[in-house]
């Protein structure tokens, strides 16, 4: 055993360094002032620069890293299984595998904690803007839902549609227009003005749909990745949501709010339509839970074009319902709660509190 530990001393030293890192991280991350300084002054500026460097590649550098890691892990596991089945010193082989795998997993997790986990205890959009989500009344929720339905109806005729009446906007054009998507809210929220890398299309978008993801922020490259397979009517709102993460906003509730608000203020009609559509869906779901009759009455005012998009979205996501999507949601819920978001995946739906607080004025 002593000889084995001597040979593996570099890995053991690395594990010791990781233990020290996590000790410091768990101790310091509770300090809001320290995290604001670290993230605002060091981590986010560096990651925005890295994300701009990643613009040399039209695709997602993060996706390349993820796929490379997955395939490397598969090959490594296969080789280890072969050595365990046919080679000598199986105990040492298994111990090497477990020790190395532990080092790799903890190193990746340490990187994630440093680049993104620290941000969960920084000032968010609500602290910086002074707009704080408040408990909303049924009457206020109904008013704002009706307002979104009216704006959505007015915007429905401004987007291209296919023969079935479903939104058929060009996905590449949507990504190309993303650079100007936040221009309409910079005057009101100047702290959001900053240079970031381009929003990236995720090549394996079908896999994202299986996991019920429309997009994600990859903290190791600072890239905003979006699902290019899900219904295009909602894509601009997703783009704006992920761009909020690039601006250092961690809360899913706040990013959903900013995604909707930025899209509705955009000069691009496809973005405006997506913003009103996403906001209406969130609001109507909340209204339905407390007053189904009134929710359906508002829905009946929508033009057929909007209903086509609602049906298309429902049909698309229905095909992915199953054990994989449920497991993915459970894991993501645990992840959010583990990083201090007590509402977990429910935080996406809680955007209605911010929407009503902001628009009911």
Regions of interest found by a model, annotated:
Residues 117-185:
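Membrane-interface segments at or immediately adjacent to transmembrane helices
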Residues 58, 235-261:
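Active-site recognition of the HExxH zinc-binding catalytic motif
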Residues 160-228, 232:
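Auxiliary, metal-adjacent structural segments of Zn-dependent hydrolase domains
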Residues 6-12, 87-102:
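Membrane-interfacial entry segments at the cytosolic side of transmembrane helices
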């Amino acid at each position: 055993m002593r000889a084995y530990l001597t040979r593996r001393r570099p890995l053991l030293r690395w594990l010791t360094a990781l233990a020290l890192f996590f000790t410091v991280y768990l101790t310091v991350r509770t300090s809001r002032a320290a995290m604001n300084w670290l993230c605002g002054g060091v981590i986010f500026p560096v990651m925005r620069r890295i994300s701009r460097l990643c613009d040399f590649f039209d695709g997602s550098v993060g996706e390349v890293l993820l796929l490379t890691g997955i395939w490397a892990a598969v090959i490594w596991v296969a080789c280890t299984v072969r050595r365990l089945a046919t080679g000598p010193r199986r105990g040492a082989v298994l111990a090497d595998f477990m020790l190395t795998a532990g080092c790799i997993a903890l190193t990746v997790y340490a990187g994630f904690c440093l680049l993104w986990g620290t941000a969960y205890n920084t000032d968010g959009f609500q602290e910086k803007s002074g707009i704080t989500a408040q408990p909303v009344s049924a009457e206020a929720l109904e008013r704002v839902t009706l307002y979104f339905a009216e704006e959505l109806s007015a915007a429905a005729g401004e987007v291209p549609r296919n023969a079935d009446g479903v939104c058929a906007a060009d996905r590449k054009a949507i990504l190309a227009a993303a650079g100007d998507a936040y221009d309409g809210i910079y005057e009101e929220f100047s702290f959001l003005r900053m240079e970031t890398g381009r929003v990236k299309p995720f090549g394996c978008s079908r896999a994202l749909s299986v996991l019920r993801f429309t997009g994600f922020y990859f903290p190791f490259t600072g890239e905003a990745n979006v699902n290019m397979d899900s219904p295009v009517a909602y894509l601009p709102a997703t783009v704006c949501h992920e761009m909020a993460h690039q601006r250092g906003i961690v809360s899913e509730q706040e990013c959903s709010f900013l995604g909707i608000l930025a899209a509705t203020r955009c000069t691009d009609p496809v973005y405006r339509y997506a913003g009103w559509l996403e906001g209406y869906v969130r609001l109507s779901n909340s209204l339905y839970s407390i007053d189904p009759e009134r929710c359906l009455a508002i829905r009946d005012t929508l033009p057929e074009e909007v209903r086509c998009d609602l049906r298309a979205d429902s049909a698309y996501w229905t095909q992915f319902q199953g054990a994989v999507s449920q497991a993915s949601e459970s894991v993501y819920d645990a992840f959010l709660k583990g990083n201090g978001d007590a509402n977990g995946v429910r935080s996406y739906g809680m955007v209605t509190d911010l929407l009503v607080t902001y628009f009911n004025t």
